């Protein structure tokens, strides 16, 4: 099962390196702006309201390309809505969603109003009318999106690859730019484009090209991409716009950088860095250990006689030191292959990537360690936002931990409608446990893991699906396992608060259930009848709510 794991670094490898000090990057302070998005859906019908009682405004975070940060805005009886979102960059690409209707728009600090008419939602190509900040730009953007939808050729990655095959990186950049900007240039032939919209669209194209080049360089093991193509054409630091293309390009950059240090796996960090970590985070050292650590952190070279002491310290505090060592080791290797601005992003990206896969106590530890090293104020604000989202439920997490810790085969309601169960059963006996809790209801089972991003997204989708179903006669059972810890699973449940039965099993139990579900991937879903028998083994996942609802209606 795919998961992100920490590698424990052999202590002896630490002694292969001389001391190298670590300086904290000086950073400036920057406060986020905000934008208020309001509007009204005229002639809103009861049917439309029941289908979608909220509109959703979402935005990107430059450190997590695959995640949209969504803010629901409840619809008032007259169809009006209002929501305020933070902004990290001067201009950010936001997304409006209402049922099956969506559009992108450009936001900056201030107020933006969006007007729609329910009578023409599915009749007009451009049912949106903007006013307020960037009104002219967004109205023109809406019209351009209609043109783009009708005229943009279907993307063909293989054809693009053939066009740049054997070409230099700079030639490839020019070829790709021409390919990606063709539709926009065609639109410009008959329309006068506002300067801000022109900058915004060209910024997106630049990063779309950069993402392709980073992917190509990773596949071809090209270590000279950022030498042959100016970094200003790949990831300019002073760009005013935050778009999904920019976040994606930087994500590809992180993968490219990781590919360049793949042969460094197993190598450690300077012994002085290790000593500094011990000095900062470990308190229960003996006088002898403390004295030697003080010597090592001030530049003394480690010797073979230090080996047993370092091993003992690491073994006693592996849960704390292992995560810090992974970070420091990775940065020490990356520092040799990327520039300082790139390293700044990679520091922030490391934490942003790992936050969802580690427990609360380790989230706090890594945040306190890494945040002071991040210099770019936009990365700092982006990281702060993601961290706050992860720890905002800490009180709930602690309350759940107080109620549920070591119970086996004893269901415990930890929150209203949220029951936790640690099971020792396998296969059919595990399903019998679900049936006992269902008490004659249908049972929708989601097999998932907090270690895997796709699973975490399905858990979120399941909660939204439950809200659509209301009080329907069905029990949601979430069967989870984690190669990290039971605590990570429990904390993920506490954050999500999806109602139903949450069951933790070990990996061999999990595999026995997956075999019964006849699935070879995680996450997976199945539907059980009131008698506990399989109705649909390979059921649609919660992220396909229409298919799930159709299946339930048939039963």
Q: What does each model-found stretch correspond to?
A:
Residues 1-34, 555:
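Bacterial Sec-dependent N-terminal signal peptides
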Residues 27-195:
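A non-transmembrane, solvent-exposed segment enriched in polar/low-complexity residues
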Residues 454-495, 509-513:
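Structural microenvironment flanking redox-active thiols in thiol-disulfide oxidoreductases
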Residues 490-526, 530:
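Short, internal strand/loop/helix patches
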Residues 521-524, 530-555:
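Non-catalytic, surface beta->alpha helical segment in thiol-disulfide oxidoreductase systems
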């Amino acid at each position: 099962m795919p998961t992100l794991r920490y590698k424990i670094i052999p202590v002896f490898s630490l002694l292969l390196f001389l001391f190298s000090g670590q300086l904290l990057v000086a950073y400036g302070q920057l406060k986020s702006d905000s934008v208020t998005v309001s509007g009204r859906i005229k002639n809103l019908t009861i049917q439309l309201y029941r289908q979608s009682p909220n509109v959703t405004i979402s935005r990107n975070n430059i450190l997590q390309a695959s995640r949209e940060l969504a803010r629901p805005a409840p619809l008032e009886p007259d169809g009006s809505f209002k929501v305020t979102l933070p902004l990290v960059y001067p201009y950010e690409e936001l997304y409006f969603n209402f049922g099956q209707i969506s559009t992108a728009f450009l936001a900056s600090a201030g107020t933006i109003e969006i007007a729609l008419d329910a009578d023409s939602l599915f009749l007009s190509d451009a049912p949106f009318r903007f006013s307020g900040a960037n009104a002219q730009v967004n109205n023109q953007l809406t019209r351009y999106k209609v043109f783009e939808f009708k005229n943009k050729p279907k993307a063909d990655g293989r054809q693009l690859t053939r066009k740049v095959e054997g070409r230099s990186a700079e030639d490839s950049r020019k070829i790709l730019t021409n390919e990606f900007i063709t539709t926009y240039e065609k639109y410009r032939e008959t329309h006068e484009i506002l300067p801000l919209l022109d900058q915004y669209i060209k910024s997106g194209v630049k990063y779309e090209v950069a993402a392709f080049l980073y992917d190509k360089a990773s596949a071809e093991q090209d270590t000279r991409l950022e030498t042959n193509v100016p970094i200003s054409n790949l990831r300019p630091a002073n760009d005013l716009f935050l778009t999904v293309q920019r976040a994606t390009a930087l994500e590809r950059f992180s993968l490219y950088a990781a590919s360049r240090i793949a042969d460094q796996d197993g190598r450690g960090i300077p012994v002085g860095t290790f000593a500094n970590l011990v000095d900062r985070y470990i308190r229960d050292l003996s006088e002898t250990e403390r004295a030697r650590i003080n010597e090592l952190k001030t530049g003394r070279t480690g010797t073979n006689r230090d080996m047993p002491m370092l091993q003992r310290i690491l073994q006693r505090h592996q849960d704390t030191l292992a995560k810090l060592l992974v970070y420091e080791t990775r940065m020490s290797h990356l520092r040799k292959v990327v520039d300082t601005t790139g390293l700044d992003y990679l520091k922030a990206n490391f934490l942003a990537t790992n936050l969802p896969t580690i427990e609360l106590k380790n989230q706090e530890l890594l945040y306190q360690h890494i945040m002071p090293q991040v210099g770019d104020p936009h990365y700092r604000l982006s990281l702060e936002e993601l961290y706050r989202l992860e720890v905002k439920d800490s009180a709930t997490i602690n309350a759940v931990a107080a109620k549920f810790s070591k119970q086996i085969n004893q269901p415990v309601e930890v929150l209203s409608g949220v029951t936790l169960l640690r099971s020792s059963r396998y296969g059919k006996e595990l399903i019998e446990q679900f049936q006992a809790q269902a008490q004659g209801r249908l049972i929708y089972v989601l097999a998932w893991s907090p270690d895997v991003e796709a699973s975490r997204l399905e858990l979120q989708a399941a909660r939204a699906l439950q809200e659509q179903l209301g009080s329907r006669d069905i029990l949601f059972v979430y069967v989870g396992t984690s190669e990290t810890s039971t605590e990570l699973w429990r904390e993920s449940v506490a954050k999500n608060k999806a109602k139903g039965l949450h069951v933790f099993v070990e990996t061999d139990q999990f595999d026995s259930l997956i075999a019964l579900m006849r699935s070879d991937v995680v996450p997976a879903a199945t539907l059980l009848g009131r008698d506990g028998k399989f109705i649909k083994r390979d059921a649609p996942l919660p992220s396909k709510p229409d298919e799930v609802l159709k299946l339930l209606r048939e039963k």
